């Protein structure tokens, strides 16, 4: 006499078995509507035939490697007319389509000699084999896992000779009783030439366009093209000081420095409507999927005379905390009639005031009318009036070679300096950084 617990367990087990049996029954019924117990109406059709035809027009190519490479397009067929309750296996092999060895010359495939001895016959058995006819008919049969190789290494891979043309062939074998061949099917539009690397660029383009697993190659190509374009000299690559980092022009764009030598950069000349490319990644607070060709600096370079204390480095757009220009004792204003130094000074922190713009004293040309609406990271700095100005000096004016070309000082009036100071303060106004 069984206990109540045993009876409940038996009912639960029976319920689970019934559920599994019903799932199997529904599986068998899925493709039964296409079935024919007599197998007289058996039909096999090629899936994606239009895509195969596009490749055939260009002479399709398939890569063969030592470790094996999968095919694209993937060979898929739809089947109808099988006995839904009978067991079948699907097999795939490849036969040579002609008696030529091929070569790619001047953009086209031409016969290139006698073929090599045919490789040992290799047959690929579909991993779902054997299975009911209903299973094969419910959905297209895909040979997506078959791999083509040029080495005889087994493992279910198909060995092919490179530079030979092949045609896939599908076989259907009835199993589970007296085994017999039902049918063999081949499709001329699936012919291809086995290669170790693609020869026709149009074939490569089609593979990348339609193969979802080839998008990485497309991304790599676009990344290389993007890098090449960014490295080409354009309107936005103006000569300037690399140590100034990122500029904030009046047009609202971000432009990196062009000079790779921070201590020997040319004069900075950036008109208010220059052609620098806008950076949507910085405006939209979203990082670019590709690395920027301009590497952000991790530390400020060292310059003579503590020039880094005069002009702060802006590392990246992430740390725009405030905009302020620290004061520096070597910031020397000059009058409008002061001539700029003719030589390259060793003090890049010397500045001159000319027409309301700020010009590095160490440069010949300076920043003339180039920073009208453009500002650096800084705030208006208040300087103690000085009673001297900078003028050009010759190399003979200093006894030490370290100070060749250095500036000499002459006394000027406080009122003259106050005028220069007001121009200096007026040209430096706070700028609100873009919201991050």
Curated annotation (Swiss-Prot):
This is T-box transcription factor T. PANTHER family: T-BOX PROTEIN-RELATED, T-BOX TRANSCRIPTION FACTOR T. It holds the Pfam family T-box. InterPro entries: p53-like_TF_DNA-bd_sf (IPR008967), T-box_DNA-bd (IPR046360), T-box_sf (IPR036960), TF_Brachyury (IPR002070), TF_T-box (IPR001699), TF_T-box_CS (IPR018186). GO terms for cellular component: chromatin; cytoplasm; nucleoplasm; nucleus. Residues 51-219 bind DNA. Monomer. Binds DNA as a monomer. It comes from Mus musculus. Involved in the transcriptional regulation of genes required for mesoderm formation and differentiation. Binds to a palindromic T site 5'-TTCACACCTAGGTGTGAA-3' DNA sequence and activates gene transcription when bound to such a site. GO terms for molecular function: DNA-binding transcription factor activity, RNA polymerase II-specific; RNA polymerase II cis-regulatory region sequence-specific DNA binding; RNA polymerase II-specific DNA-binding transcription factor binding; sequence-specific DNA binding; transcription corepressor activity. It is linked to Embryo lacking the T gene fail to form the notochord, the entire posterior region and the allantois, and die at about 10 days of gestation. It comes from the Eukaryota. Keywords: Activator, Developmental protein, DNA-binding, Nucleus, Transcription, Transcription regulation.
